[in-house]
A protein has these predicted regions:
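Alpha-helical solenoid scaffolds in eukaryotic macromolecular assemblies
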Residues: 1-167
Length: 167
């Protein structure tokens, strides 16, 4: 099962054998292309464990893009892909740290995710937090209002709304 590939890749990753882990993930994806965790692991290994180089950023992007094509309803996959885009500027030392560009790409990715999964409170919450991390308080409040209209019974959104409400 895909779980065997995943656990084997985790073992290789823990042993710092990143190439072996990625080979196992690719082999697992050939047999189980609808397994979102394998795409997540591939993207995370490329973005977090390998050196912060442009080639590894592209490898991580490809894992997430392939995963989103196969599993478009997986909120965690969308979230990881948007976070990768948000911090993409840390991968390119030749370019000045352009966080605004990363936030723009992350924002558009989350917008697409919410169009495909409008009833996913996790995606709304990630979009709200992205705006807060980038200092767009008004936009975050506007998104929160829309999110609560779309998902009125979401405990996570209600909790976030209460925690971030002005006192």
């Amino acid at each position: 099962s895909s779980r065997v590939y995943m656990k084997s890749a985790i073992l290789e990753r823990d042993e710092k054998q990143f190439d072996a882990a990625l080979r196992l993930i690719e082999a697992g994806l050939k047999s189980y292309p609808k397994s979102p965790k394998l795409y997540m692991m591939g993207g995370q290994i490329c973005s977090d464990s390998l050196p912060k180089e442009k080639a590894n950023l592209e490898r991580a992007r490809k894992f997430y893009q392939r995963g989103l094509q196969q599993c478009p309803n997986n909120a965690v996959l969308w979230t990881l892909a948007s976070r990768l885009e948000e911090r993409a500027s840390t991968f390119d030392s030749a370019r000045s740290a352009d966080a605004a560009s990363g936030a723009t790409k992350a924002r558009s990715l989350l917008e697409l995710a919410r169009l495909k999964n409008p009833k996913s409170p996790e995606l709304w919450l990630e979009a709200i937090r992205l705006e807060r991390r980038n200092g767009n308080q008004k936009l975050a409040e506007s998104l929160m209002a829309k999110a609560l209209q779309e998902n009125p019974s979401s405990g996570a959104l209600l909790a976030e709304s209460i925690l971030t409400a002005p006192r």
